[in-house]
Amino acid sequence: MLSTLKRFGITTGATAAASAKASVIYLFRNETPKSVTIPTPIGLRLEIPVDDYERRGEEYCATVTKFSGDNPDVLNGLKIVSCSTKCDSGIFIEGGNGIGVVTKPGLKVEVGEKAINPIARQMIIDAINEVTTDGVKVRIEVPDGEKIAELTMNKDVGVINGISILGTTGIEYPISDDEYLEHIKSEICVVKALGKKKLILAPGNTSFEFARKRYGDNVVKIGDRVGDSIRLAIEQGFTHIVLVSLPGKITKVASGLMNTHSKYGDARIETLTHAAVLAKLDIEKINKIANSATVTEAITYLLPEERKTLFSIVAKRVLQRLRKIVKNDVKLGVVIISEEGEVLAEEGEL
């Protein structure tokens, strides 16, 4: 049983969108609401408190605090400030102090640009559009961003001198908490009650949406808890389990990590390098993969057919790892997709 109801949080993208909307309201209406409501990419609307307002010459600024709910997060309590000024036309979003700079390829932001994810950027624009269609320039800054970034993995993925503004849904799920297993178990039981024998497990939002379109309503989002979720599924009597994932998390499973949270380890690049050797890629590409900061960067060095060959090897290794914890009478399948929804590999019984 859950000891408490679990609290969801908001992403840095949602926090920035709220501060941007509040600052624009202050700029155009001279109002300082205690909270603002913002749209999200998944259709939900979030009401988010605003901490403070401030005039800086011609700029109108608002501060919002990031809330991470019950998900352990070094960014919990982070202050994000947006400062707005009028301009002739259009909406211009720029990263200020405390927002990191992208230094390596493979991310969704170009090298040299401020680390504001495209989906988060669109969330900010959508929030502003609810206030005005006039021209406005918004600068987003994080007062302690550079210091706090040292506690994150930003440098490892090629973002320096600040944090990233991220988020695909605006909502931060408590996926790393032990009690989240109760949520997973409950959802597995719901699928069981539908009379399904095949269960689809998806770690994140993108893989979950892909799996729902492909398999229907027998999909459960599992976060980092791959091994535990498979164990729970078997306990509930499922005889066919398919794991659908983006390359990053599934590569961790291929390395033997059944909990993909960063605190348990990370051998993604090493695993991909090994797969590249098995795929007999040329030494130059193997070296590029071995020196990549992220899986996404490594993928950029591969031709389409090379990607499929490489991730077919990864998927087969995942099946080998899973088979060690699953009896032979349970069917297993693995589907690896890109962030754009391209199928990179399909192995096992699907």
Curated annotation (Swiss-Prot):
Pfam family, one: CbiD
Gene behind the chain: cbiD
A Gene Ontology BP annotation from the UniProt entry: methylation
Main enzyme class: transferase
Pathway: Cofactor biosynthesis; adenosylcobalamin biosynthesis; cob(II)yrinate a,c-diamide from sirohydrochlorin (anaerobic route): step 6/10
Name of the protein this chain belongs to: Cobalt-precorrin-5B C(1)-methyltransferase
Protein origin, superkingdom: Archaea
MF terms in GO: cobalt-precorrin-5B C1-methyltransferase activity
Keywords per UniProt: Cobalamin biosynthesis, Methyltransferase, S-adenosyl-L-methionine, Transferase
HAMAP family named among the record's database cross-references: CbiD (MF_00787)
EC numbers: 2.1.1.195
Catalytic activity: Co-precorrin-5B + S-adenosyl-L-methionine = Co-precorrin-6A + S-adenosyl-L-homocysteine
